[in-house]
């Protein structure tokens, strides 16, 4: 039995809410909470995270500590927090009041901004209309990668390069159990990394409701519990994220189609799945469902990855088709009908029938309900907030970061933008440089890019040279018996400086950050080739690709330097 001490409860209803929150924590079998005693008794499975327990309570606005936690450890943790708060307060010594920062949203950009603003001495009011944590942890990056990993394991059990010595088998898929495992990890991370952190910081006030601008110095918040509240601010960050876009296809809105949110929450695997779209989300989920047992058809308006180097789309299309995924290029749905539990899609290549329909054609910024015009904030034609490198909007008091802006829609970009916005909102000067921004698509093989493609460089007037190394020249790929894909390096003609890398490989995401650092540090291709790379790693492919500018790597020994 695990015991918690809980402070802040004021009634038996508080205790009931705490009990409900604790019993949602993965690993908690039961909870007995007493308001008069200020305690909770928990039956938990071994390995249950103590941080998740305390975070669940903190998320409700109360404080929880393990009753049997070592006093010294508690003191150290408390002292560390006090030192942090005092250091922030020192930034605003004297009579100068702290900057009042309002943050709309609670995802990656919002959290990063709130925490950095507090470090800078600000008082933060964070406003969230839905579930704390935003898209990434709740319905995006985290659950999708868990599902993709499970699908990868199922695929390897069914088929691998080592089937000659390791007998293949058809796995039994229990989607409901996979979903429970997936959701447990999502809940754990949300408690530990969002709710608990917010609840444990006295400089952050969380308001649950929907915000809209009253003017350029205040917000009106329609509270989830009823009523309204006005929040005044010196600076405001809009970090409201984005939602799945829905194309105007006749009959679509009247049908029970899936977006990525519903697909990730489904406890069944459809026999037939049609996917409209060739976005990152569309392709990642298409392959995951196929590997878990669905017969998948992808409808791509153009080709896969048509904005990238053509070789990328060709490689992924070939990999999908090899797994039995049907890819219909240059195909659009002109009509959607749902009859007798079946979707019927009218397309430019005939009729398509499916049990479920996933629509993943991009994401739309969540800005329409904010009354941005009342604050003089400019948006583009898509509704995205227009910002500069400092995350400043057209209103000097209002900043924006993340998917609600015209920045690339990646959570790590959002978090970096949120941090820099907070610095600028509290009197600093920080800019976000995206010239060496790595991007990864978690298909198999993965797609990873950074910097210029050749076409992009030529568009900007840069003369280039390039080399493409197929993976049958990379020892790690040969040892894996999986040589699908390539690594392409793009250099600036004359200076020979590396300016872009595109990779399609089973672990391309693990090598692209090295390429990003090389570009960021303005390395030449020869300097990259001269570096030491561990033998039999996929990232060694970068060195080999760099060597191809001056020699034939097929004529080198295995680990020639």
From Swiss-Prot:
A metal cation binds at residues 11, 14. One of its GO terms (molecular function) is mercury (II) reductase (NADP+) activity. The gene is merA. The keyword Disulfide bond applies. This is Mercuric reductase. Transmembrane segments: none annotated. FAD binds at residues 110, 130, 135, 145, 211, 403, 411. The active site is a redox-active disulfide bond. Its cofactor is FAD. Homodimer. It comes from the Bacteria. Residues 2-65 form the HMA domain. Its EC number is 1.16.1.1. Resistance to Hg(2+) in bacteria appears to be governed by a specialized system which includes mercuric reductase. MerA protein is responsible for volatilizing mercury as Hg(0). Plays a pivotal role in mercury resistance under thiol-depleted conditions and cell protection. Protects cells under thiol-depleted conditions. Belongs to the class-I pyridine nucleotide-disulfide oxidoreductase family. Hg(2+) binds at residues 558-559. Pfam families: HMA, Pyr_redox_2, Pyr_redox_dim. Signal peptide: none annotated. It catalyses: Hg + NADP(+) + H(+) = Hg(2+) + NADPH. The keyword NADP applies. Disulfide bonds join 136-141. Keywords: Disulfide bond, FAD, Flavoprotein, Mercuric resistance, Mercury, Metal-binding, NADP, Oxidoreductase, Plasmid, Redox-active center, Transposable element. Binds 1 FAD per subunit. One of its GO terms (biological process) is detoxification of mercury ion.
């Amino acid at each position: 039995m695990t015991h918690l001490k809980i402070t802040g409860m004021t009634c038996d209803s508080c205790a009931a809410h705490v009990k409900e929150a604790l019993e949602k924590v993965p690993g908690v079998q039961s909870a007995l909470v007493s308001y008069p005693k200020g305690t909770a008794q928990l039956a938990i499975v071994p390995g249950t995270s103590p941080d998740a327990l305390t975070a669940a309570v903190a998320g409700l606005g109360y404080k929880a500590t393990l009753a049997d936690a070592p006093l010294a450890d508690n003191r150290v943790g408390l002292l560390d927090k006090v030192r942090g708060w005092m250091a922030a307060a020192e930034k605003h010594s004297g009579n100068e009041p702290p900057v009042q920062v309002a943050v709309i949203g609670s995802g990656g950009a919002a959290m990063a901004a709130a925490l950095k603003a507090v470090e800078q001495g600000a008082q933060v009011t964070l406003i969230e209309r839905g579930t704390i944590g935003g898209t990434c942890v709740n319905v995006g990056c985290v659950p999708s990668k868990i599902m993709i990993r499970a699908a990868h394991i199922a695929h390897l059990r069914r088929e691998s390069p080592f089937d000659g010595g390791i007998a293949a088998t058809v796995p039994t898929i229990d989607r409901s159990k996979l979903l429970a495992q997936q959701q447990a990890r999502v809940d754990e991370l949300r408690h530990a990394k969002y709710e608990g952190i917010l609840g444990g910081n006295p400089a952050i006030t969380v308001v649950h409701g929907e915000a809209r601008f009253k003017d350029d110095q205040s917000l009106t918040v329609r509270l989830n519990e009823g009523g309204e509240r006005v929040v005044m601010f010196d600076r405001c960050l809009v970090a409201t994220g984005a939602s799945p876009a829905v194309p105007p296809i006749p009959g679509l809105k009247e049908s029970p189609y899936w977006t990525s949110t519903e697909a990730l929450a489904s406890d069944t695997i459809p026999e037939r799945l049609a996917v409209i779209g060739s976005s990152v989300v569309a392709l990642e989920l298409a392959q995951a469902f196929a590997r878990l047992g669905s017969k998948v058809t992808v409808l791509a308006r153009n080709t896969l990855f048509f904005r990238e180097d053509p070789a990328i789309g060709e490689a992924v299309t070939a990999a999908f088709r090899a797994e039995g995924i049907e890819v219909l290029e240059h195909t659009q749905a002109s009509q959607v009908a749902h009859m007798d539990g079946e979707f019927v899609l009218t397309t430019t290549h005939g009729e398509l029938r499916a049990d479920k329909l996933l629509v993943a054609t991009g994401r739309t910024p969540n800005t329409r309900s904010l009354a941005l015009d009342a604050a003089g904030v400019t948006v583009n034609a898509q509704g995205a907030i227009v910002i500069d490198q400092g995350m400043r909007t057209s209103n000097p008091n209002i900043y924006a970061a993340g998917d609600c802006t015209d920045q690339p829609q990646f959570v790590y970009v959002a978090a970096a933008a949120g941090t820099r916005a907070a610095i600028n909102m509290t009197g600093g000067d920080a800019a976000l440089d995206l010239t060496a921004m790595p991007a990864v698509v978690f298909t198999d093989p993965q797609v990873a890019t950074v910097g210029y493609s050749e076409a992009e460089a030529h568009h900007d007037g840069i003369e280039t040279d390039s080399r493409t190394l197929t993976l049958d020249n990379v020892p790690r790929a040969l040892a894996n018996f999986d040589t699908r894909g390539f690594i392409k390096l793009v250099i600036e003609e004359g200076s020979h400086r590396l300016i872009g890398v595109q990779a399609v490989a089973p672990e391309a995401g693990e090598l692209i950050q090295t390429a990003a650092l090389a570009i960021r540090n303005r390395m030449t291709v020869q300097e990259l080739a001269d570096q030491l790379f561990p033998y039999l790693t996929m990232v060694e492919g970068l060195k080999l690709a760099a060597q191809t500018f001056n020699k034939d790597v097929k004529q080198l020994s295995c680990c020639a330097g």
